[in-house]
Amino acid sequence: MNSPLAPVGVFDSGVGGLTVARAIIDQLPDEDIVYVGDTGNGPYGPLTIPEIRAHALAIGDDLVGRGVKALVIACNSASSACLRDARERYQVPVVEVILPAVRRAVAATRNGRIGVIGTRATITSHAYQDAFAAARDTEITAVACPRFVDFVELGVTSGRQVLGLAQGYLEPLQRAEVDTLVLGCTHYPLLSGLIQLAMGENVTLVSSAEETAKEVVRVLTEIDLLRPHDAPPATRIFEATGDPEAFTKLAARFLGPVLGGVQPVHPSRIH
């Protein structure tokens, strides 16, 4: 039986999942968080589905083995690659980033034309397209935007170069006259201002990070595992499988003062 005092485990291929962690902290400030950024193997977008699945399940095994009460796959590529395996493998609730965003997009659209942008792995997996299949009267246009992650990981979230890239990527969505756009990668909220500028103010942007945090609230409430308000102050642990110093510098853009030190993960612990 899981304890309400146990932490919530969150992982991503790098720093993008910190947008999810930030949203969870905002909505559930009393919860302990353990976050693992797999910067030693990520970004996952260019990898094959079997490679992504292997890396993601190794981190999931580590977090579940450490006693988390819920596991959040804060990565669209990993969600599309290993969600079914994770839910069969673990005895704790597994929350992913795709379905929460799909539900919000269906509720938000006015003309039924919805766009999805993500990594090449996410778009070619058809995870979003399949998730939208149950929604009536929707027309989905999905576009891979692989270089967005590179810019975010470099800390470049504005400027002429990335705006030009965005305009090129998003042109098919404008032609399709989408009125709602799912940011199908947890890195992309850091580009939301630029994406909104390229798409126009009448297009609603749906952040998978915000919707996933709402799903974590719903799941923990449903199974009565919310951390009590009178519990000791929340602790947040951030770990990286790659260079912790580089992770810390970039992660500060996502979390600001909430971010403490980042601990390295020894390769022998996750394999």
UniProtKB/Swiss-Prot annotation:
Q: Which PANTHER family match?
A: GLUTAMATE RACEMASE
- Sites where the protein binds substrate: D12, S13, Y44, G45, N76, S77, T186, H187
Query: What broad taxonomic lineage does this protein's source fall under?
Result: Bacteria, Bacillati, Actinomycetota, Actinomycetes, Mycobacteriales
Q: What does the record give as the reaction this protein catalyses?
A: L-glutamate = D-glutamate
The UniProt family comment states:
Belongs to the aspartate/glutamate racemases family.
Full protein name = Glutamate racemase
- EC class of this enzyme? isomerase
Q: Quote the catalytic residue positions.
A: C75, C185
Q: A single GO molecular function, which one?
A: glutamate racemase activity
Task: State the InterPro entries in the record.
Answer: Asp/Glu/hydantoin_racemase (IPR015942), Asp/Glu_race (IPR001920), Asp/Glu_racemase_AS_1 (IPR018187), Asp/Glu_racemase_AS_2 (IPR033134), Glu_race (IPR004391)
**Pathway involvement of the protein, from the record:** Cell wall biogenesis; peptidoglycan biosynthesis
> What are the EC numbers?
5.1.1.3
